[in-house]
Amino acid sequence: MKVADVPQDLKYYKGAVVRDQNYAVDDEGRYHMVKSDGWEPKNEALALALQDDKDKEERSHMRVQPTTDFQGFELDLRHQPAAHCENGAIATLLSYYGIHLSEPMIFGLASGLFFVHLPFVKMSGMPVTAFRTFPGILFKRITKLLGIKTVTKRFLSKERAMKMLDKVVLEEQKPVGCVVGMYDLPYLPPEYRFRFNGHNICITGKNEVTGDYCVLDSNATQKVTISRDDLIKVRFATGGTYPLLGQMYWIKSVPEQLPDLKPLILKSIHKTCRNMTSQPDFIPWAGANGIRHLSQSIREWEQKKSSRKAKQNLAQVIRMLEEIGTGGAGFRFIYGAFLQEAAEKTGLTILNDYAMRITEIGDMWREFAYKASRIIKKRKGENYTYDELGDLLQIISEKERQFFKDLDHTNESKRSSTGFEIL
């Protein structure tokens, strides 16, 4: 596969999902950089968010830290891009121990796909909409499935947090995942720095003379460095979604032999299906119920809020759908890639049909993003309405509910016929 051959307007390439406007995954699960100017709705949502950002003035004076070759102690790990930061951090930690799993497989095994719309939880003053499970759950789930022992720490003391980081990286010589705030990461372009305190990076080395740390960040294009002061600032970021407490996590030990992936794949598919369809009606914010709840709420935004505020809410949903590391369409394309790989590893070729179905649902999410961006722009001759968006979300909700019910039924019947046990 040649990178230049990947067409930007197609969702598939040789049977695999083109996961993002910046990367593509080939039919062997390998990711490749793809040159692109970006996808328009995503860019328009970002432009609106930046225009109204209270940090606009400060952001205008930000400069990107130049990339330099790291000098100092460094673990033998290569940088690899990923659609989502937690997937990327997990892949890096696992690879250090010789465990090489693709990003879709990590995401699928951890039952990462989800939906939640929380009008009572705010990010940048607007309701939080998420298309995946809550931060930290992916690492916890996949390591438990694989029988890997891990450690997670949080701190009140910044000094203790940095001493523990140095101990694990320098003395134990293990890579460490850190949860950080994005706003003060010096190597990111200013337009991609916002007050989101849930980004995952890996620390893989330290220069004990300068105090700089070597960082593997799947959002960056290569290995980067960060100063001790900047690392403290992002590990204990305030504002944004919630204050951080220097959270760090690492692998303590791995079993001599990993378990067979086949039953784990089926178990994970079952868990994802249950998460999306078994939410009770009195919890209207999660799973397929949550999509329906958003479809109802979105119709009221223009009447109950100002036109400007309604557009900002739309932009927030688009950003969470397309920009926040989802690989496109709220992780639906990545989940399609997982089902393709699952079909190969389990021999259940029918999962390829489900991969196509979830990717087609992903196309509907992209249609939603496109129409929402047209409302934001209000271009001549384009008269999409909030009611139309609500109708589309209602259809998506019904399709996802049916998709996951069908997938769970197929998964259960195949498990029974093959003898795989789902716990």
Predicted regions and their residues:
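A short beta-strand micro-motif
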Residues: 3-7, 11, 15
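A short, charged, amphipathic alpha-helix used as a generic interaction element across diverse proteins
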Residues: 6-9, 45-53
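Acidic, low-complexity, intrinsically disordered interaction modules
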Residues: 13-44
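Conserved active-site-adjacent core of cysteine acyl-enzyme catalytic domains
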Residues: 50, 61-101, 112-246, 250-255
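Short helix-capping/linker segments at secondary-structure and domain boundaries
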Residues: 95-104, 339-346
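Noncatalytic regulatory segments and standalone regulatory/sensor domains
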Residues: 208-324
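Charged, long alpha-helical assembly modules
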Residues: 316-423
